[in-house]
Amino acid sequence: MSSSVHNNTGPVQLPEERRFLSASEAAALERELLEEYRFGRQQLVELCGHASAVAVTKAFPLPSLSRKQRTVLVVCGPEQNGAVGLACARHLRVFEYQPSIFCPARSADALHRDLTTQCEKMDIPFLSFLPAEVRLIDDAYGLVVDAVLGPGVRLAEAGGHCARALATLKRLSIPLVSLDVPSGWDAEAGGDAKDAVQPDVLVSLAAPKSCAGRFSGRLHFVAGRFVPDDVRRKFGLHLPKYTGTDCVASL
C-alpha cells in the first residue's frame, strides 16, 4: 500500500515502494535525470558503463581468474545499451581485464563513434565477425557481456545481424552477463521468447525493470547509485543500500 505524510495542506500520498520499474516508468526516470537534473546522455552512459564493469569485477574477481578467464567478449548493439557496453569494455581494460568488442551493427551515432575511438586508442580489439561455431568463442574467452539490445529495443527492429549474434550467444557455455535487460527479453514480461538469452549475471541500470523479477541466474546487481534520493522516492524504489563507496549493490 502507498504511504502518506502530512504537510500544512494535509496528507500527501507517496508512491508504493517496490523494486521494479515498468518500461514507461524507466523511461520517465531517465527523462527526469536528463531534463530536471540536467544529466547529459554521455554522462549517464559513462556512469552505467563504469558501474557495469565494477559489477563484472565483483562477479568474476580478477585474482580468482586464470589468464584465459580474464578475456571478456563485449557484444555491443547500435542503441544506448551498446554505448554502455563500449564504456564498460574501456573500464574493464583499466581494471586489467582483457576485453574484445564485437558490434553486430555499427551505429552512426556520435556517442558510439566517440566511445569506439576511445576503445581503439586503448588497443581494445574489435572483431570483424562473430564465429558461428560457439566452441571457438568458449575456448577464446572467459565470459561474455551482452549489451546488444536493452530496454525498448525489440529484436525485429534491431535487424538480422543482431539476431544472428544472439542466436550464437544463446548457445555459449561460458558465463553471460547482461546489461539492464537481457537481449531478446520483453522489459515487462521477461525472457520466454525463443530468441532470448538466459544470462548468469544481470546488471540492472538505474533500477531493475519489471522483467528482472523473472531472472533466475546466479547474481543480480543494481547499478544506480547516481540516482538522487528524491528521484528514488518519487518512483517508490525500495532497493538495497550501497556499501561504502560501491557503485553497485547486490539484489
Swiss-Prot record:
Recite the UniProt keywords alphabetically. Answer: Lipid transport, Transport
Can you supply a Gene Ontology BP term from the record?
regulation of Notch signaling pathway
| Gene3D superfamilies reported in the protein's UniProt record | YjeF N-terminal domain (3.40.50.10260)
User: What InterPro entries does this protein's entry cite?
Assistant: YjeF_N_dom, YjeF_N_dom_sf, YJEFN_prot_NAXE-like
Q: Boundaries of each YjeF N-terminal domain copy?
A: 26-239
Under the subunit heading, UniProt states: Interacts with APOA1. Binds to HDL.
Its annotated function is as follows: May accelerate cholesterol efflux from endothelial cells to high-density lipoprotein (HDL) and thereby regulates angiogenesis. May orchestrate hematopoietic stem and progenitor cell emergence from the hemogenic endothelium, a type of specialized endothelium manifesting hematopoietic potential. YJEFN3-mediated cholesterol efflux activates endothelial SREBF2, the master transcription factor for cholesterol biosynthesis, which in turn transactivates NOTCH and promotes hematopoietic stem and progenitor cell emergence. May play a role in spermiogenesis and oogenesis.
Protein name in UniProt: YjeF N-terminal domain-containing protein 3
Per the UniProt record, the source organism is Mus musculus
Provide the gene name from the record: Yjefn3
